[in-house]
UniProtKB/Swiss-Prot annotation:
Domain F-box: 239-297
MF (Gene Ontology): RNA binding
A biological process term (GO) from this entry: SCF-dependent proteasomal ubiquitin-dependent protein catabolic process
Domain RRM: 112-201
InterPro entries: F-box_dom (IPR001810), Leu-rich_rpt_Cys-con_subtyp (IPR006553), LRR_dom_sf (IPR032675), Nucleotide-bd_a/b_plait_sf (IPR012677), RBD_domain_sf (IPR035979), RRM_dom (IPR000504)
Pfam families: RRM_1
Domain of life: Eukaryota
Coiled coil: none
Name this protein carries in UniProt: Putative RNA-binding protein EEED8.10
One term under GO cellular component: SCF ubiquitin ligase complex
Keywords, alphabetical: RNA-binding
Region listing for Disordered, in residue ranges: 211-237
Biased composition (Polar residues): 224-237
Length: 738
């Protein structure tokens, strides 16, 4: 504020000595008021902001601040020695003409600007500038547009929409006043009434919002679809004030926000900063793969991880850094996890490659760790796994080391008796010594998944049956077990507590094993035999023995030639069966489908690729399960069968018919397993194997096309003749080899 100009009348009307003395008294009084209010009369947010800066920085640096208030403060500072001098009694009438508003006069540039809101999405910047040129010459027109989105399909519009708010600068302030005083009808453009308001700069307004001098006069103005920043800010402030939200509620709301939004809220104000920091106390689990802010264009870096874990690490119980696009410095990243997250119970660092020393440091710091996942580490050696488990392996209850191609298992001796679940699928180099160490140190193991662990032996399986009495889940899928025999698989029948067993693609499965399992595993509830054994090793006798598993709820017998209608009739005694998959069962006919009508708890039936199944049995199955209140739906998959969708009716039934053909999934898995077998050292060449697979697939497709699209012959009503015909056709097509 220019004090010389403010008191010009006082200085000119009295003598110089008396006038100076009166001025000093007035300034001293003003100085006292300023000291009480801690600012230059504390009149606006601009002065408050400036005084805040002045209190926290030395007065000598104020010359770098070029605002109007800074210049006035420098003048005021030069008069401080005189203000502190003693004087006579102060006459209050001498300062009655003091006008504080002169310090806040609008600059000429701001007077020439206006803010236009509620702009139609069709309006372009040139159109808007041409429209307002009727009020005067325009020097600039800024109409921001939304961020342009991209799509590989080319379905998005070529031009992005405008944001609905523009800033226009006129050459003269009189022209801006004309636009402000214009009638609403004059501001109608594309059937929308635009709203013109005064421009308030960020420096004078104190906030980055568009403010207006006549908010009340526009409260009743009808607005169209778009809404300006002004109307949004004023409307939300009148209806709902976030400052009145209780701290606990605000903290709870912030805890549900994405991580990057939670960190951004710290910049809003002091209250939001405090509640944002406290909200991390409510977050005990973080899965970084869910944070969409990290992608190929913006990968996660170590600084991002540190910023997150310094806030949330002390409260985290579970951390998952797998599946995220990152450029992490592996050593520093693991050090950040080890330092910031001492209370972790569950950790997934899959995809994070690191040296053995960094893994050892991580294991030392996580004394409470119970679940560890480090899967897909195809290039990580056995040494790294050893140092990772060296200090925390004894306390682990769950370990996932799937697809660790270079893992031999020397670290398994570090596991303790608390280990309950171990996943080793695809870790093909885990040898027999590792399984011996596992049986010695982990007698309480309940879940063991060793699919494609091809170095396991008969002795290992026997030791597992004897030492792991609590084992309830066992998976032994794959077709490359060279050190395992069919006789060794019989040891599985001695594991009395097994409830889930999977032997998919295991060529060692035979009738003897199925009969032993049916007699020795009374608690078995899930059995998977997809593509197991061969046509000669698994017969109808072995599959029929499954009827003795009274607790069975899930069964997968896909691609087993022994599965036919007679076998399904015997399996109809499994009253608890809920899910049954019979894909590519080429000898399964309508009678087998009718046998499922005796299963009251059935929920899912997959008949994909079972080409002898027709509309008759499918329609009977649909009618057997009428709809009713609180009755769950039943899914019936009939893709690849002889079913005709146009002749099926599901009215009044709770059966949902799915015409998808999932039998190709089985074919793909077969080809993958075959290729892996050749890579290990099969006798056939890759070219010969590929030709055999192609011929088998072609024969199967030809058989299916002939069955569905061929010319109709006289129907065969006798089941025996139908079976003979199917066998004859299969032999002629090469599906059955003598």
């Amino acid at each position: 504020m220019d004090f010389n100009r403010s008191f010009t009348s006082n200085l000119g009307s009295a003598g110089s000595a008396k006038s100076q003395q009166s001025m000093f008294k007035a300034l001293r009084r003003l100085h006292g008021q300023n000291l009480e209010s801690r600012g230059l009369h504390d009149m606006t947010e601009a002065f408050q902001s400036f005084v805040t800066r002045a209190r926290f920085f030395s007065i000598g640096k104020l010359r770098r601040t070029w605002s109007h208030s800074a210049a006035e403060f420098m003048k005021y500072r030069r008069l401080l020695p005189m203000l502190l001098a003693d004087g006579d009694a102060f006459d209050g009438g001498e300062t009655d003409d003091f006008d504080a508003s002169i310090a806040f006069q609008h600059t000429s540039r701001d007077d020439r600007k206006i803010v236009v809101s509620n702009i139609s999405a069709k309006v372009t910047q040139s159109q808007l500038q041409s429209f307002f040129s009727q009020y005067g010459k325009i020097t600039s027109c800024i109409l921001p547009r939304e961020e342009k989105k991209t799509s590989v399909f080319g379905t998005l519009p070529k031009h992005s929409r405008n944001c609905g708010t523009a800033t226009i600068t006129f050459k003269k302030s009189e022209h801006a006043d004309r636009a402000k005083n214009a009638n609403p009808e004059e501001l109608k453009f594309y059937d929308q009434v635009m709203v013109v308001s005064a421009y308030v700069s960020k420096k004078r307004g104190g906030k980055g919002l568009v403010l207006s001098d006549d908010v009340g006069s526009r409260e009743d103005t009808p607005l169209s679809r778009a809404s300006s920043t002004q109307s949004l800010a004023s409307g939300s402030e009148q209806s709902f004030n976030l400052g009145n939200v209780p701290d606990k509620i605000l903290r709870r709301v912030i805890s549900f926000l994405p991580i990057h939004e939670t960190i951004r809220l710290e910049r809003v104000n002091k209250k939001f900063m405090e509640e944002s920091i406290k909200s991390w106390e409510l977050v005990n689990k973080i899965a970084l793969a869910r944070e969409t802010v990290f992608n190929k264009q913006r990968p996660m870096r170590t600084s991002h991880l540190k910023a997150i874990l310094t806030r949330a690490g002390a409260h985290l119980r579970s951390l998952d850094v797998s599946g995220i696009v990152h450029l992490l410095d592996d050593r520093r990243a693991l050090k950040v996890i080890a330092t910031c997250c001492p209370n972790l119970v569950d950790l997934d660092i899959s995809g994070t490659h690191a040296q053995a020393e960094a893994l050892e440091e991580l294991g030392e710091s996580l004394s409470h760790l119970e679940q560890l996942s480090y899967r897909g580490m195809e290039t990580t050696g056995d040494k790294a796994f050893y140092f990772l488990l060296k200090n925390c392996g004894h306390s682990l209850k769950f370990v996932d080391l799937r697809n660790s191609k270079r893992l031999h298992g020397r670290s398994f001796k570090l596991f303790g008796s608390q280990l309950e679940s171990l996943y080793l699928d695809g870790s093909s180099k885990v040898d027999e010594m590792a399984f011996e160490d596992l049986c010695t140190s982990c007698g309480g193991l309940k879940e063991l998944r060793i699919n494609e662990c091809y170095k396991i032996t008969d002795e290992n399986l026997s030791m597992i049956a004897r030492r792991m009495e609590d084992l309830s889940i066992l998976t032994l899928c794959g077709d490359g077990f060279k050190s395992l025999t069919s006789a060794g698989l019989i040891h599985i029948s001695h594991m009395r507590n097994i409830t889930e067993l999977a032997l998919d693609y295991n060529a060692l499965v035979n009738d003897e094993l199925l009969i032993s399992i049916s007699a020795g595993l009374p608690l078995l509830s899930s059995l998977s035999l997809a593509n197991a054994g061969n046509d000669s090793s698994i017969t109808a006798e072995g599959v029929s023995a499954i009827k003795n598993l009274k607790e069975l709820t899930q069964l997968d017998a896909s691609s087993l030639a022994a599965v036919n209608s007679k076998v399904l009739e015997q399996l109809g005694s499994l009253k608890k069966l809920e899910i049954i998959q019979l894909r590519n069962c080429t000898y399964l006919g309508d009678d087998g489908v009718r046998a499922k009508l005796r299963m009251p708890n059935i929920r899912h039936v997959d008949l994909s690729g079972s080409i002898l199944v027709s509309n008759d049995s499918i329609q009977q199955f649909i009618k057997a399960f009428p709809s009713g209140p609180k009755l769950p739906p039943i899914t019936l998959v009939v893709g690849g069968t002889a079913a005709d969708a146009s002749k099926l009716s599901v009215r009044g039934s709770r059966v949902v018919v799915d015409f998808s053909d999932y039998s190709t999934i089985v074919t793909m898995q077969t080809s993958q397993c075959s290729s892996s077998k050749f890579a290990i050292g099969g006798s056939a060449s890759d070219a010969e194997g590929s030709d055999d697979e192609f011929e088998a697939l072609t024969a199967q497709r030809s058989f299916y096309i002939d069955a569905v699209c061929g010319e109709e012959e006289s129907p065969i009503t006798d089941d025996g003749k139908l079976a003979e015909w199917a066998e004859k056709e299969a032999r002629s097509l090469g599906l059955i080899k003598d």
